[in-house]
Amino acid sequence: MSDVRQFGAKGDGIIDDTEAVRHAVKKGDGALFFPSGTYLISGTINIPLSTRGPSAISGESGTSTVIMTGEGPAFRLAGAHQGTGDPGSVKPAIWNQERMPTVQNIALEGKNPNADGFELLGTMQSVFDGVMVRRMRHGIHLVKRNRNVVISNCHLYHNTGVGLYLDRVNLHQINVSNSHISYNRLGGIRIEGSEVRNLQITGNDIEYNNAKTHGKLDSEPTAEIWIDTTDPDSSVNEVTINSNTIQATSSAGGANIRILEKEDESRPPGLITISGNVIGSQENNVHLSGVYGVTISGNIIYSCTNRNLLIENSRLVTVGSNHFRRHTPSRGTGMRLVSSEDCTVSGCTLHDESENGQESGASLLELEKCQRIAITGCVLTDGAPYGIDAADCSDVRVTGCIITDKRKVQKSRGAVSFTGKGKRNGVASNNLSGKINISPEVEVKLNENIN
């Protein structure tokens, strides 16, 4: 173990320890250790894995703090891995010199607006455990190419950029678990311009990632989890977002979970499951645009200023067994599907708690220019103007639902509405406590509904 104090570091929070830490990296055994104390550094500590051998950065049970006063990452872990996660693609030198760089039990703080926490490139099997990064720009910054990353039991807190930033990186296999990722101005977990596969986000608290706690810094559209594949050659597939608390304060253009794709022939984001989460308090709680093959199930999704779930230009989205409502009187609720096809909504409950209908005037479940949508076994209560409101839709099937207005003074105009143009729509075997509104140019067949 290379104790940085043995290489000249003071750890008193006053003396600049940059050169002492660099000396420990160059001459030590690879296990960089910071005893309890506060260590000032003014420049990046580069750890070239190919020349240093297996490496680690550790503090003393969380009592060690490194303060970065310069620009750039406090620590850069740079490897040479250009293969995949397949054992046959990993060169012997990677196993011998570079595998599993580990960071644990240490805190980082920034005193420069352009300081980052950790930057990783070319690494194989990197591990973060028990790490705090605060008051930096980006907390953990993954660039270029990495494989098999594990991040657990970490605090990425109150940074001016992104907590965990996958930035134009080719990365397969990454697990993020049991961590707090909160109050980061540009997002909690953000993926842009990258090729990512096998991402698991499980058991985390991801909250309040917007500009509201950052004083005069500019506010930008953000999300707790942001996946953006609009750049050329970027793609994200095989993602699990399970068992997290994902909430915020509403911000302009904000979302709790946002997945975006451009309209072209490239592979859209898909093979994504969002399950068993508590998601709430943003402009749009879940916003999907251009996705293909996403499942949203078993979530509590609450309190929006626009929609709980907004789906645009998407295909094969399965929405099942979720609960949608507002949580505070100033917020709203509801789902909206636009220009989407081959989707199902089943086993969901949607409830408008407002006395007079939502300020937005939105129905609980809206469809616009959609095709082949199955709505089955849902309970929609107190929707105004309608429980289900479809415009310019075809092949929409509403079956086995209960749609009612339970208010003493009803505010709903009806249970279901079809307007614009459309063909082969059906409403069957539902319990409806309001009328069905059908425009003349929409084909809707009714069968065995209880009114």
Where are these regions (language model features)?
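Extracellular beta-strand/beta-solenoid scaffold signature
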Residues: 42-47, 69-93, 111-120, 134-142, ...
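N-terminal extracellular ligand-recognition/capping segment immediately after the signal peptide
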Residues: 18, 22, 26-72, 108
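Consensus "Asn ladder" position of solenoid repeat domains
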Residues: 106, 131, 154, 159, ...
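Right-handed parallel beta-helix/beta-solenoid
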Residues: 1-20
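Well-ordered beta-strand segments characteristic of repetitive beta-sheet solenoids
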Residues: 31-34, 45, 55-59, 78-79, ...
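Parallel beta-helix/beta-solenoid
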Residues: 29, 52, 56-61, 70, 77-136, 202, 240-247, ...
